[in-house]
């Protein structure tokens, strides 16, 4: 016979409270050709709610993790080089750790303390960089415009558990798009994860086993839109 399940302990948890502080600015420079957004933030969270793997290994439950703090910066830049070329870059840094987290005891009655560990599912770095170049044609031409676009998106490091024993290191994906615009038709040919990068998008544990949800491989597609 297994240990009797305490339903109240697994279904009842306290509300989460947080104090959030943020300063930032939005700038438009060089007659609007360069736009920037800058921000810095700090979050002080108490009774933080997280999804925790249960000791039996059969699923997860919501628990209060004590307190945590998060701080970081975000920056984005959008530049219109000329009427044909646009470029954008964005970056974010987040440092999110538990200030206090009593994880209970192990089967051998050893105390579990996750204080100082990183909060799971929070990427430390996020970034995006992209560029679009457009060719514009005479309005009498059947082709109105042709746009070539490329972008690179990255994230990591990401911890998947409060133990910080499973993680995904920093990864990036390359994406591209070609858009053809006519008076009534728009055709987009696109590719995602062009380098076929392999990474983990989610992790969970059940029956004392860990399972990873893997990334989607290289994808190619075509979108067609008709304007009435």
Residue ranges and their predicted role:
Residues 30-32, 82, 181-183:
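Short strand-coil-strand connectors
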Residues 42-44, 63-161, 225-227:
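Gram-negative outer-membrane beta-barrel transporters
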Residues 12-71, 92, 96-102:
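Membrane-embedded beta-barrel scaffold of Gram-negative outer-membrane proteins
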């Amino acid at each position: 016979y297994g240990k009797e399940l305490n339903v109240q302990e697994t279904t009842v948890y306290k509300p989460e409270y947080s104090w959030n502080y943020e300063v930032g600015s939005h700038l438009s420079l060089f007659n609007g050709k360069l736009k920037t957004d800058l921000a810095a933030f700090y979050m002080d969270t108490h009774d933080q709610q997280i999804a925790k793997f249960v000791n039996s290994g059969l699923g997860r439950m919501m628990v209060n993790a004590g307190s945590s703090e998060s701080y970081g910066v975000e920056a984005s830049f959008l530049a219109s080089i000329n009427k044909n070329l646009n470029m954008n870059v964005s970056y974010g840094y987040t440092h999110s750790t538990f200030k206090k987290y009593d994880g209970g005891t192990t089967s051998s009655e050893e105390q579990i303390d996750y204080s100082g560990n990183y909060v799971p599912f929070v990427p430390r770095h996020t970034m995006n960089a992209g560029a679009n170049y457009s060719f514009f044609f005479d309005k009498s031409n059947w082709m109105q415009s042709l746009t070539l676009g490329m972008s690179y998106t990255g994230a990591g490091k990401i911890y998947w558990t409060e133990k910080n024993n499973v993680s995904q290191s920093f990864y990036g994906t390359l994406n591209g798009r070609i858009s053809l615009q006519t008076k009534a038709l728009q055709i987009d040919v696109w590719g995602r994860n062009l380098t076929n990068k392999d990474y983990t998008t989610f992790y969970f544990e059940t029956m004392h086993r860990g399972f990873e949800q893997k990334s989607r491989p290289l994808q190619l597609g075509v979108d067609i839109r008709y304007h009435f």
